[in-house]
Amino acid sequence: MSVKPIPGILRPCISSVLPKLDGGVNVILDVGANADCKADVLYQFGILGSLFAEHVCGVQTPRVGLLNIGEEESKGNMLTIAAHEMMKDSTDFNFCGNIESRHLFDDECDVIVCDGFSGNVILKQAESVYSLIKQRQIEDDYFDRFNYENYGGTPILGLNNCLLYTSPSPRDSCA
């Protein structure tokens, strides 16, 4: 069987999870498959993320947020403004508006939609903060949930079959 996009899906995306401070996770997508996106692609990420949060993470009526530099509708670049315009009246998912990066680990939403460039930067930053915390020998159950070595892989959503993306850590690579 070949693996290909589900009919109607413009671009599959890599999803990941960010631990919420008070329990649970925020699904974030895309985290690296699509560095450049159009508004309709981000809209589809909202659908895929909402379905994943509901059926895999067990969230009833997931709230979908669009990563942006401000909470106001008029904030952002041309992409996020156009995506917000499409998402705000969605009947395909429960859109809760723009989400600023300071709310990534809050309970403001359950799904965070962004392009793969931004999502990958966020993911790498979370990994970096976890590494700094461990180097400082800070023990905390919440921060232990950021340990990427505990995750075998992360799903690529929008495909007709299950496919996990895995990335070896630099220390596991051949020299």
Predicted regions, residues:
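Glycine-rich phosphate-binding loop
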Residues: 1, 75, 80-143
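Short glycine/serine/threonine-rich phosphate/pyrophosphate-binding segments
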Residues: 1, 10-12, 38-39, 121-122
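Glycine-rich phosphate/diphosphate-binding loop of Rossmann-like nucleotide-binding domains
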Residues: 38-97
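A structural-propensity feature for long, helix-poor, extended segments
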Residues: 21-35, 153-162
